[in-house]
């Protein structure tokens, strides 16, 4: 696994969509990638991991997890950019088993997003320990297989507020 210390072109970009409408989300994704100055050529022929926030088994309307329309739109964009494969993977809270992942993907809408976009859902629950010898405190990390095996990783969080 290779990492890079290069600085992003734009550290943060926010794009508003007034509702979860597929056309609005598609336009928002296009604009977001444009603001971040991310060229489609980066993804050509690559195995790309989309890492949503799938904290727990919740319906999209509960606004706990990354919305599946956003993941579908991003996967569609990646395939238009000629990504070789798009994988949806996370290590949610609770049990990390194929059965638990199946339930979370179904409830959170990721199964439908994958079916509609052609993305692949991860059911590999293995991990690899990687070293970070120059780290100050934690020098080893357990990373799930799809993270280690991906050429590129796009982390797509869920913007939340907590009291």
Question: Which ranges hold each PLM region?
Answer:
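N-terminal and secondary-structure boundary signal
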Residues: 1-163
């Amino acid at each position: 696994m290779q990492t890079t210390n290069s600085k992003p072109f734009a550290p943060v970009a926010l794009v508003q969509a007034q509702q979860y409408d597929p056309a609005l989300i598609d336009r928002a994704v296009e604009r977001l990638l444009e603001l971040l100055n991310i060229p489609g050529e980066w993804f050509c022929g690559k195995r790309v991991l989309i890492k949503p926030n799938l904290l727990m088994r919740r319906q999209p309307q509960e606004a706990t997890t990354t919305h599946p329309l956003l993941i579908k739109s991003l996967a569609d964009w990646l395939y238009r950019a000629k990504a070789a494969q798009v994988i949806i993977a996370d290590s949610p809270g609770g049990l990390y088993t194929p059965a638990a992942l199946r339930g979370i993907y179904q409830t959170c809408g990721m199964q439908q997003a994958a079916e509609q976009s052609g993305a692949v859902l991860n059911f590999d629950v293995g991990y690899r320990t990687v070293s970070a010898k120059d780290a100050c405190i934690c020098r080893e990390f357990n990373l799930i297989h799809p993270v280690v095996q991906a050429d590129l990783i796009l982390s797509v969080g869920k913007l939340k507020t907590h009291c």
